[in-house]
Amino acid sequence: MSVLFTILLMAVIGGFIGAMTNYIAIRMLFRPYKAVYLFNKRLPFTPGLIPKRRDELAEHIGKVVVSHLLTEDAIRARLLDENLQREVTETITKMFHEKMKLETTPNELLHHLGYENAEVRSISWLERTLEIEISRFLTTKQSTQMSELIPSMLENELTKKLPHVTERITSKMSVFIASEAGKIQIKQMLQKFFEEHGKMGSMARMFINIDSFSEKIQQEGLKLINQEDTKNIINQLLTTEWHNFEAKELQELIPTEKQAHLAGQLTSEIIQAVPHEKLFNQPIQGILRNYESAITEKMIPFAVERMLDFVATHSAEIVERMDLAKLVETQIATFSLPEIEKLVVEISGRELKMITYLGGILGGFIGIIQGILAMWI
């Protein structure tokens, strides 16, 4: 009976020593947090392993995360994953539909973004910019011929339209001359002609019937206007005037002293033509509603795909610039030692307990062997 008791006692003592040894070893990973001094000499194993190697641990964890976890290939693969693209697209689409239920004007949106008096400031900026740019254009181009300022496409179109302009002019002239107003105008011109020539005019009026003579001039005028030679002459005149206009420099048409006034006038006309009150006070949703399906079905998926593809393509540069290793190291360094201990215990508390129990089991087994050997010796 004493033999069995001795063996059991040795087992209990060995188990206790083994369990306590492992428990103390585990605690020494974290404790003490600071070095302990005795007679001005630091005691061994103080501070604990993790507090002592905290900076090195943070640095190595950062390197491991970047080298083996958040690698360039892993990030690129995740960004190009179809499931991620679908989830991001669905999230943005949902947010878009939620915003479409609201009534938000550009003024309100810019106000939320911290841009006060958006309408007034935007119009003022546009007005200043337009006037500056128009003035700069007039100044830098004042020695340039109009042919260089007019776009070639517009120049070609205007040149092609000259015969049509001629037809338009002759047509309008024919209509006017053939009208009653034209007849009256011709008669008044004849009367004025006779009056301006004094006695000779008075004598001519004695032999000429103004009404019949006016009708004759009206008829001959219509014949003259509708002749091809007349149309050709008008067309040649228009062409010549057009070429003369193109050959002129800008400063001939707009003298330097009038450029500032013209710039201000053009700016004022443009600003008045812009419906800024409607633009800034009309709900954005009303403008977008006609394109809602196109935005959700085409634009958002396309934008998400392009965005993720861009980030994936430049993932190496982004990771390098973000310096994830340093970021992880910095974040770990901000943890207090109790927080690190709590984090490790929460993650591997069960395993740490099993190590303690294993120490007790091994200690007990060794105690049994020691008890048996003690009986034999």
UniProtKB/Swiss-Prot annotation:
Location in or out of the cell: Cell membrane
Domain of life (superkingdom): Bacteria
A Pfam family matched in the record: DUF445
Membrane topology summary: Multi-pass membrane protein
Keyword Cell membrane set for record: yes
Membrane-spanning segments: 1-21, 357-377
Keyword Transmembrane among UniProt keywords: yes
Cited InterPro entries: DUF445, UCP032178
Keywords: Cell membrane, Membrane, Transmembrane, Transmembrane helix
Assigned GO CC terms: plasma membrane
Principal location listed in the UniProt entry: membrane
Family statement: Belongs to the UPF0754 family.
Protein name listed in UniProt: UPF0754 membrane protein lin2327
Species annotation: Listeria innocua serovar 6a (strain ATCC BAA-680 / CLIP 11262)
Lineage: Bacteria, Bacillati, Bacillota, Bacilli, Bacillales
